Amino acid sequence: MACVSVDTCQFKKILAALPELPPHNWLITDLECYDTSGWDGCEKWAQRELLLTDETFRQDVKKRDMQFIWGVFSAIPTGYSEAEIRRYPLPEAETPRYMANSILPQHPLAILELYAQDGGLTFVSAREASLLEPLYRLDGAVRDEEADNRVMNTQLRRIQDILRQAVPEVSPRIADAVQWRVWWALFREKTGNVSDWFLRQAVMAEYRAQVRSPSRFPSVYWDPYAQK
């Protein structure tokens, strides 16, 4: 099990860096592509869902290196028919699974997955960690997403420990809003330790703010305790 994030949603360099995989096709779901007009073969990239041969996929990427905004690209061995592939739930783009400590390709038959997120990052996950090792030689930021998530979920548990000690019956909605607002303010892209006293002040201030004026954005509570 392994996952790395690469700071691009163009796949030409990513595909070139990957080692040779067993013969496979690409199941592409929840697709949103920036470059869907003005070149031969572009029409298919305006669809939300595709099943392409590896040859066709790589030819188009090599020719155009189009930017993907969203999409899940699942490499599935050629021995499986389309009917067999569709027996399982199709992979989704907007899912919290990429915040987990352990990340696998969503489709049970996939050996590797590319996930384009909001036009800026690609998450590459595989059932064998060795498949991802060459990606660390790419230019730009390449990060071990599982390692980053373990740190993040530890930080979220610190926030929740303080909140639940003070407010044992806190609602999931408020708990989720508090943990993310505090995490973004104190931990996101910052180094150094945050003291318990300072964190407690921030957590309780955000809790009071949420009670007075709850966040209007719907959310599903992300449980960092489930990631231990």
Q: PLM features: residue spans?
A:
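Acidic, low-complexity, intrinsically disordered interaction modules
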Residues: 173-215
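Extended non-catalytic scaffold regions that mediate assembly and binding
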Residues: 173-176, 217-228
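Surface-exposed, low-hydrophobicity interaction/linker segments
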Residues: 40-115
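Ordered hydrophobic segments in well-structured contexts
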Residues: 3, 25-29, 70-75, 113-114, ...
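Acidic, proline/glycine-rich low-complexity IDRs
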Residues: 103-161, 165, 218-224
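Short, aromatic- and cysteine-enriched interfacial helices/patches
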Residues: 162, 167, 186, 191-194, ...
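A broadly conserved detector of short glycine/acidic/proline-rich loop/turn motifs that flank catalytic sites
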Residues: 32, 77-79, 128
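N-terminal interaction modules that seed assembly of large macromolecular complexes
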Residues: 2-5, 9-60, 182-183, 187
